[in-house]
From Swiss-Prot:
Coiled-coil ranges (or none): none
Compositional bias ranges of the Acidic residues kind: 433-442
Gene: paip1
Name of the protein in its database record: Polyadenylate-binding protein-interacting protein 1
A GO molecular function held by the record: translation activator activity
Species annotation: Xenopus laevis (African clawed frog)
Function: Acts as a coactivator in the regulation of translation initiation of poly(A)-containing mRNAs.
């Protein structure tokens, strides 16, 4: 009967140390012995009398009718569940299969009600857009101004992220900016950021160009580019008064002038046939702004004019030449008169003279030759004239033209190329440390930028 009984894993192993050993000596099979449990009582009493030990904990779910444990047998007789009426081997298998599942359920600390997990560095506030109807992301009501301002501040700190983040930004605006008031507010935010933060003028102009071509909204009156030019027109009409104003007014006016120059270079207008042109109104506006700056020849006005011409001079002159206009000649003439007559500082006069030299050199542009043909021994008779001459161990000179020494010549030439940057005395000929460079002084524009940088650094330290 015991041969056909399947013992559950682990059951009876602990009892084999005491009672199971004596049953083996008595000729009985260790472990469960079928339905007879009375024969184990003498052995149990003898083991308890010879050695006092803590009774073993009964299993949570023991097999019914087991003769090894009287307490477990008594408990099993009291149960009335259907499992108690199953065969012994079936119930034992059920116990052995249920134990790993119970153990895993007790050790697990996972919960379906746990809070949502976010990786480190993930910002929930920066991703507060939600999808609506599977189309464009939408912002919660009343947060458009904060969203746009945060994005502008982010571009100011990280202008390199423009290409990656401007597309989702325009998607949000396409779904949120639906009225003339919200569009006007968007234009004003970008304009104020461009003239209040000097380093944002270029990025702001790029952003204006992108939005003017990709902001697909249909307001009742005007689009983004029209409202932007209208806002610039309002500031443009104050040019003479601003050029004569105090230092703060002139500083704001100069920021507007440079932003308008960036707009002229970056704002693209697509024609009816798909051609891309620049805004003509900005071209004429820059000419008027230069006249206002030269009409009030104080140092900061003249320096602003120099910066504007360095930025847009070559493009303006090319555009005026296409129309057969001599506007750049008039600008240069006014600049020379300022150098001769105005009571500006010596550094500013030096900046103006250098700008005249820059324009005389075609604004520093170098046009490559239209045709280029690589020199070879067949098409260039002077091909071997600039090649070095080597000598054999016998003192016989040879060059690349000698066919008997071509292999040896190439080997020596490669060795010379390996030490190309070193002179005969062992020093590095290409190292600027050994060169006498007297032109290490900063020009006035660089000095001004450096002073501004130092002042901004001190201001940030005090905050």
């Amino acid at each position: 009967m015991s041969d056909g009984f399947e013992r559950a894993p682990g059951v009876g192993r602990g009892r084999g140390r005491g009672r199971g050993i004596e049953t083996a000596e008595g000729g009985k099979t260790p472990g469960f012995s079928g339905a007879s449990g009375a024969g184990d009582e003498p052995g149990r009493a003898k083991a308890a009398g010879s050695q006092q030990q803590e009774p073993l904990r009964p299993p949570r779910t023991g097999p019914p009718g087991g003769g090894g444990d009287a307490g477990a047998a008594q408990t099993s007789h009291k149960r009335t569940s259907p499992a108690a009426q199953l065969p012994a081997h079936t119930y034992t298998m059920a116990v052995s299969k249920a134990q790993p599942a119970d153990r895993g359920r007790l050790l697990s600390n996972l919960s379906a009600n746990a809070a949502e997990f976010y990786p480190s560095g993930y910002s929930v506030e920066a991703n507060n857009c939600v999808e609506e109807n599977g189309c464009y992301p939408v912002l919660p009501e009343g947060t458009l101004t904060e969203y746009v301002q945060d994005f502008l501040n982010h571009l100011t700190e990280q202008p390199g992220s423009f290409e990656a983040e401007v597309f989702p930004f325009s998607d949000v605006l396409n779904n949120c900016v639906t009225t003339d008031e919200s569009l006007q507010e968007l234009v004003e935010l970008i304009y104020q950021q461009a003239i209040s933060v000097p380093n944002f003028s270029y990025t702001g102009a790029r952003l204006c160009n992108y939005l003017s071509n990709n902001l697909h909204i249909n307001p009742q009156n005007q689009n983004f580019r029209q409202l932007l030019l209208k806002r610039c027109q309002t500031e443009f009409e104050k040019r003479d008064q601003a050029a004569k104003g105090d230092g703060a007014a002139r500083k704001q006016f100069h920021a507007f002038v440079l932003f308008l120059g960036e707009l002229y270079l970056n704002l693209e207008i697509k024609g009816a046939k798909g051609q891309v042109t620049r805004a003509e109104i900005l071209q004429s506006g820059l000419q008027e702004l230069l006249n206002s700056l030269f009409s009030n020849p104080v140092d900061d006005n003249l320096m602003c004019a120099v910066k504007l011409l360095k930025l847009t001079g070559s493009v303006l002159e090319d555009a005026w030449k296409e129309k057969a206009l001599s506007c750049m000649e008039e600008v240069m003439l006014r600049m020379k008169n300022v150098v001769l007559d105005a009571n500006c500082s010596r550094d500013v006069k030096q900046m103006l003279l250098k700008l005249v030299e820059l324009r005389s050199s075609n604004w520093g542009r170098v046009h490559a030759a239209s045709t280029f043909k690589e020199a070879t021994p067949e098409n260039d008779p002077n091909y071997f004239m600039n090649e070095p001459t080597f000598y054999t161990s016998e003192g016989v000179p040879f060059t690349a033209a000698d066919p008997d020494y071509q292999e040896k010549y190439q080997e020596l030439l490669d060795r010379e190329d390996f030490f190309r940057d070193y002179d005969e005395n062992g020093t590095d000929g290409g190292d600027s440390y050994f060169e006498d460079d007297d032109d290490n002084e900063m020009d006035p524009e660089m000095e001004e930028a450096y002073e501004k940088f130092c002042l901004e650094s001190e201001h940030k330290k005090k905050q």
